[in-house]
Amino acid sequence: MKQVIKYKNREEWLQNRSKGIGASEAGTVLGLNPWETPYQLWRRKKGIDPPKVENFAMVAGHLLEDAVAQFFKRESHCHIIKASTDDYTITNTDTPYMRVSPDRTFWRTGATHNEASKSILECKTTQMQIDADDLPKHWFCQLQMNLGVGEYKDGALAWLTAGREFGYRDIDFDPEFFGWMRDEITKFWLDYIVGNQEPPAYSAQDVLLKSPLHKAGKEIEATAEIGDMLIELKEIKEKGKTLENRQKEIEDNLKLFFGDAESIVDGNGRTLATWKAPKASEKFDAKAFQADHPEECAAYIKQVQGARRLLIK
């Protein structure tokens, strides 16, 4: 059974997001969000990393929700429900840690204006070109979680690309997909958030977060697959070196041809290449300052741990 929680202001709504898994985080839990991994989400939820601060893109997306909704209304002729513009959260008594806040709800043309006939609209602003037949997977997950927790039968994803192109797609609720997603989110919440287990690394960045330093002397035996990867990587690096050497050779020959000229042009005067010195700039001579004022510098010198380097032997 669903429950609706209303808030006094957006700040209160933002604070409430930390109490569960939001629809925008569903794709992350499933490993389908290109911007964040399950491990990084876990670190944020557990307070290891600071909470997300609304950046310009996030604020702009919120402010432009109404514009996207109006484009959707214009194209689809659906009725946007005004009350749905407020900040609120829908939860379900069965899974109270799954918390959704649909951007808008609407009634389709000809539908009876009652609760059972409502549909959900998710509004997106993006710089990416969107293919309506191949929508971003984390967008799809977000809408399905909104539909499932909110107990709606269908909805739509609408997007505005670079402020110039608008598109939308109607999407039905998929009970089978939602059931699988609910199970995965439940496992993530109970095992990692409530159970305090640390999730496995999902990317190389996760490994650096988990293990910024190596364990001296520790060795692991390569599997056949890893052995093949190492051989392939060495071959790729060798090809890269060959290309880099050829690139340098060509650049050196071009510079010999330039002499003291600024540009190389074709027979029609079109510029093909330039070789110019940058304008002179002022630079603080740290080494000279340290030599002249060693005591003052000593108070500001600190040890900085370098990142782990991958070397192929």
Q: What are these language model-derived features?
A:
Residues 1-313:
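Accessory terminal regions of nucleic-acid processing enzymes
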